[in-house]
């Protein structure tokens, strides 16, 4: 019985899942939007949101914790220098999942997961406002 066991298995063993979400979290922080399956996007939220919350208070200890979870110095720098200050006033909910149809090969439901309030979103909204 798998009572009270949270998280999705995604047909992978635990080390594969951990490595996959570490890579996906790094990609999401680096590019601020990625395309993946809906199930992986929902699980990725559980990895990325605590990282951004950690980045809101900049300290050596928090940077080391973030590095231990991502293993990427560039990503840690972006987390603490850009994303932490950007989301300082937001109490959680840093990601958005937008469903985008089915994958061609196997009809898996796909989605974009993006960081809320990324600069491209703000520019697009301003362009729409000026066009009206």
Swiss-Prot record:
Keywords linked to the UniProt accession: Ribonucleoprotein, Ribosomal protein
GO biological process: translation
Gene Ontology CC: cytosolic large ribosomal subunit
Highest taxon of the lineage: Bacteria
Gene Ontology molecular function: structural constituent of ribosome
Gene3D superfamilies, sorted: Ribosomal protein L17
A Pfam family the protein falls into: Ribosomal_L17
Subunit structure: Part of the 50S ribosomal subunit. Contacts protein L32.
Family per record: Belongs to the bacterial ribosomal protein bL17 family.
The name this protein goes by in its record: Large ribosomal subunit protein bL17
Organism: Shewanella woodyi (strain ATCC 51908 / MS32)
């Amino acid at each position: 019985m798998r009572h009270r066991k949270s998280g999705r298995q995604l047909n992978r063993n635990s080390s594969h899942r951990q490595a996959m979400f570490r890579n996906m979290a790094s990609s999401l922080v680096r590019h601020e939007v990625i395309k993946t399956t809906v199930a992986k996007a929902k699980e990725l939220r559980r990895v990325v949101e605590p990282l951004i919350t950690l980045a809101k208070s900049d300290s050596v200890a928090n940077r080391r914790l973030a590095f231990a979870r991502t293993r990427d110095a560039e990503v840690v720098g972006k987390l603490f220098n850009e994303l932490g200050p950007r989301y300082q006033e937001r109490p959680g909910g840093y990601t958005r999942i937008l469903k985008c149809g089915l994958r061609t090969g196997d009809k898996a439901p796909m989605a974009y997961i993006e960081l809320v309030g990324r600069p491209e979103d703000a520019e697009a909204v301003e362009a729409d406002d000026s066009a009206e």
